[in-house]
Swiss-Prot record:
It catalyses: 2 D-alanine + ATP = D-alanyl-D-alanine + ADP + phosphate + H(+). Keywords: ATP-binding, Cell shape, Cell wall biogenesis/degradation, Cytoplasm, Ligase, Magnesium, Manganese, Metal-binding, Nucleotide-binding, Peptidoglycan synthesis. It is found in: Cytoplasm. Residues 161-372 form the ATP-grasp domain. Pathway: Cell wall biogenesis; peptidoglycan biosynthesis. This is D-alanine--D-alanine ligase. One of its GO terms (biological process) is regulation of cell shape. It comes from Arthrobacter sp. (strain FB24). Its main location: cytoplasm. Binds 2 magnesium or manganese ions per subunit. The keyword Nucleotide-binding applies. Belongs to the D-alanine--D-alanine ligase family.
Length: 382
């Protein structure tokens, strides 16, 4: 992004665009969000941007984060967390501008000034699901990533599939289970699952990072898997197991009227052993539990088709900024869309930036491009 382009969108009184990096949140993916933020805060160009790190504690409190968050990492014994503070951050309208205010008991509130763009690195409910996007829309604040509707659809695995099917994209067999349905007639649910055929995957409808997901091979394990998923969400999606390779594709919004850009597809391979599928530990905790091959070893026509379908999925939900689209590639060459993630993991080791790196766009450049897209996107209905 050129200096002229940056200055065009910089609030009066700012030498460079002010970027509020928002992370943490109330969801069970709080720690993952913190690690994502650590990656971005470690790579963003501080010569180009005035960066304000804002954490959301699990209580919902917004705090100004100090210290070296770039060292945060995930391990079996270490889950980073935003700590509540007496000094809270709010977004308030002052002099016709929406500004960040730091307030604490018995102190005069401190004005941090206007924000040019918010980079919400929030995963899961109350952040990735349209809630924070709605707040930012109400305050007429530009932000990175998908808008309210696309974020909400991308968070709900049930309605995501409804939208994909309406757009002519092939999804696998599944059922959606509401809280009321399970509580009032669990036997009917067991029969519906039996018709899907085992194995099945039981998932919280509105959770990510493989939280609460179980593979179930028979009726005997179904109720326990449902109970585990319901700890994360009372609405569930139960999917028939699909034999196929796990293929992913990164999507980046096009500039202006250009179509979405797609990376070379990558393939996830889970190492043989204790992980039956790509679960939370394989994703984030154990370095050798899974590997990414990019570009995936696929025929040229399959690679082209993955990229075409990934862009179609991006457009189907009305996404903006970035998304990662996941597929199954079956032995007979079918591509079945699994899901779209409108705020994918964004550490330097995450699949989304790795696929772009393999496609010629580095991590710092990717951050620049996302901020550029947000600064140049109009607010309000679009």
């Amino acid at each position: 992004m050129s200096e002229e382009q940056l200055n065009k969108h910089t609030a009066p009184g700012h030498a460079k665009p002010r970027v509020a990096v928002l992370f943490g949140g109330r969801s069970s993916e709080h720690a993952v969000s913190c690690v994502t933020a650590a990656g971005v805060l470690g790579a963003i160009d501080y010569d180009k941007y005035d960066v304000i790190p804002i954490g959301i504690a699990k209580t919902g409190q917004w705090v100004l984060v100090s210290g070296d968050t770039r060292q945060w990492s995930l391990s079996a014994s270490s889950l980073p967390e935003v700590s509540p503070s007496a000094r809270t951050v709010t977004l308030a309208e002052i002099g016709g501008e929406h500004q960040l205010i730091v307030a604490s008991p018995n102190e005069v509130p401190q004005e941090l000034g206007a924000v040019d763009v918010v980079f919400p690195l929030l995963h899961g409910p109350f952040g990735e699901d349209g809630t924070i996007q709605g707040l930012l829309e109400l305050s007429d604040t530009r932000y990175v990533g998908a808008g309210v509707l696309a974020s909400a659809v991308g968070m709900d695995k049930h309605y995501m599939k409804v939208v994909f099917e309406a757009a002519g994209l092939q999804v696998g067999p599944y059922i959606a289970v509401t809280d009321r349905q399970w509580l009032t007639d669990p036997e009917a649910i067991r029969k519906r699952v039996d018709r899907l055929g085992y194995p099945v995957f039981v998932k919280p409808a509105r959770a990510g990072s493989s939280m609460g997901i179980s593979k179930v091979d028979s009726l005997e394990g179904l109720d326990a898997a449902i109970a585990a998923a319901r700890e994360h969400d009372l609405k569930l999606v139960i999917e028939a197991g699909i034999v196929g390779r796990e293929i992913e594709c990164a999507v980046l919004e096009g500039r202006g009227t250009e179509p979405p850009r797609t990376s070379m597809p990558g393939e996830i391979a889970v190492a043989p052993g204790e992980h039956e599928f790509y679960d939370f530990n394989a994703k984030y905790v154990e370095d050798d539990a899974a590997s990414l091959s990019c570009p995936a070893d696929l025929p040229d026509e399959a690679i082209a088709r993955v990229r075409e379908l990934a862009a179609a999925a991006f457009d189907a939900v009305g996404a903006e900024g970035l998304s990662r689209v996941d597929f199954f590639y079956t032995p007979d060459g079918e591509l079945i869309i699994n899901e779209i993630n409108t705020m994918p993991g964004f550490t330097p080791k995450s699949m989304y930036p790795q696929m772009w790196a393999a496609s010629g766009l580095g991590y710092a450049e990717l951050i620049d491009e996302l901020i550029y897209l947000a600064l140049n996107r109009k607010t309000g209905l679009r």
